[in-house]
Amino acid sequence: MFLLYEYDIFWAFLIISSFIPILAFLISGILAPISKGPEKLSSYESGIEPIGDAWLQFRIRYYMFALIFVVFDVETVFLYPWAMSFDVLGVSVFIEAFIFVLILIVGSVYAWRKGALEWS
């Protein structure tokens, strides 16, 4: 039978952890100064006046490499617990992990063939 009172501490933690950031934003909005002078609108470069254009555009290639990094970072997050409990889980979980890695390899090869990893 599913008993909800077993999760009381979870709900208390969820409510408190949601309330603290909201409270922090409200307090900073109330206590923060509201002046919008020229110093507030200028960009900050190591305490000196900025020279040249302070707004630079990043090349889209940086985002592609960051996206590929996130994919393999998520793969690590999923495969590490699996590797730590490999002897307990059995063959079916091994096949699922193998299919997961195979899908990631196929996606990486596809991105490589399409030129997503080229820097030109």
UniProtKB/Swiss-Prot annotation:
Gene Ontology cellular component list: chloroplast thylakoid membrane; NADH dehydrogenase complex
GO biological process, one term: photosynthesis, light reaction
Bilayer-crossing regions: 9-29, 64-84, 88-108
Molecular function per GO: NADH dehydrogenase (ubiquinone) activity; quinone binding
Domain of life, per lineage: Eukaryota
Gene3D superfamilies per the UniProt record, alphabetical: NADH:ubiquinone/plastoquinone oxidoreductase, chain 3
EC main group: translocase
InterPro entries xref list: NAD(P)H_OxRDtase_bac/plastid, NADH_UbQ/plastoQ_OxRdtase_su3, NDAH_ubi_oxred_su3_sf
Keyword terms of this UniProt record: Chloroplast, Membrane, NAD, NADP, Plastid, Plastoquinone, Quinone, Thylakoid, Translocase, Transmembrane, Transmembrane helix, Transport
Membrane topology (UniProt): Multi-pass membrane protein
Pfam families: Oxidored_q4
EC numbers, comma separated: 7.1.1.-
Entry coiled-coil feature ranges: none
Compartment list: Plastid, Chloroplast thylakoid membrane
Chemical reaction(s) catalysed: a plastoquinone + NADH + (n+1) H(+)(in) = a plastoquinol + NAD(+) + n H(+)(out); a plastoquinone + NADPH + (n+1) H(+)(in) = a plastoquinol + NADP(+) + n H(+)(out)
Leader sequence residues: none
Record-stated family: Belongs to the complex I subunit 3 family.
Subunit structure: NDH is composed of at least 16 different subunits, 5 of which are encoded in the nucleus.
Function: NDH shuttles electrons from NAD(P)H:plastoquinone, via FMN and iron-sulfur (Fe-S) centers, to quinones in the photosynthetic chain and possibly in a chloroplast respiratory chain. The immediate electron acceptor for the enzyme in this species is believed to be plastoquinone. Couples the redox reaction to proton translocation, and thus conserves the redox energy in a proton gradient.
Protein name: NAD(P)H-quinone oxidoreductase subunit 3, chloroplastic
Organism: Glycine max (Soybean)
Gene of this entry: ndhC
